[in-house]
């Protein structure tokens, strides 16, 4: 009887220990799985944001390219062109070309928007803050292009053109990229802003 009771107790202890061990293993496994899942989510989000960032950089570079190719410059519809002077036809083509270049910038910003919202939910505000420098440079370039097109518009009256030129002359001229390897001030500021974002995101790409 003694040995039977002892054996039952031992068996109970063994079963309990096995259950506890199994629970510990399960909890550790769940913890590892959660870490792996979060790591994968961080990796994918960081990868998407970096790719979109590089595409945005290239789109902004394209806006500033000093050459405007013939295929970029459309003619107005024939019924409109027939009643337009050449300087207005030229301005129409330039405006459409810059609009097409800027549409590409807007497309990449739109692609970034949802991912930046997700990053804010997962990582906080730091990345959004880092993108503030990119947004400021983008807005500065937009104003520069907008003023250039207004000044060159044949329909802009002389007084408005003078006022716009005064504003333009008080600001730095960033319309054209100088295409040097070292880069101009605008490009170097953009590079520095991108490097700060890369430094934040690249640790999240380590798996």
Regions found by a protein language model. Give the residues of each.
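Amphipathic, membrane-active segments
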Residues: 31, 35-75
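Interfacial loop at the N-terminal end of multi-pass membrane proteins
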Residues: 68-80, 90-93
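Membrane-embedded hydrophobic alpha-helical segments
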Residues: 1-36
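An amphipathic alpha-helical interaction surface
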Residues: 80-83, 92, 96-207
């Amino acid at each position: 009887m003694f040995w039977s009771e002892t054996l039952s107790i031992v068996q109970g202890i063994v079963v309990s220990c096995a259950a506890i061990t199994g629970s510990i293993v399960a909890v550790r496994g769940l913890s590892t799985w959660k870490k792996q899942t979060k790591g994968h989510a961080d990796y994918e989000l960081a990868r998407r944001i970096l790719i979109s960032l590089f595409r945005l950089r290239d789109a902004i570079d394209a806006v500033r390219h000093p050459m405007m190719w013939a295929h970029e410059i459309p003619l107005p519809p024939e019924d409109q062109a027939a009643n337009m002077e050449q300087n207005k036809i030229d301005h129409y083509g330039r405006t459409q070309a810059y609009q097409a270049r800027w549409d590409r910038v807007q497309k990449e910003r739109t692609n970034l928007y949802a991912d930046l919202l997700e990053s804010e939910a997962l990582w906080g505000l730091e990345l959004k803050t880092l993108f503030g420098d990119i947004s400021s440079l983008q807005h500065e370039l937009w104003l520069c292009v907008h003023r250039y097109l207004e000044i060159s518009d044949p329909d802009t009256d002389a007084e408005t053109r003078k006022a716009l030129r005064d504003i333009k002359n008080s600001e730095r001229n960033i319309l054209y990229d100088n295409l040097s390897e070292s880069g101009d001030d605008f490009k170097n500021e953009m590079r520095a802003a991108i490097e700060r974002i890369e430094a934040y995101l690249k640790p999240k790409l380590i798996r």
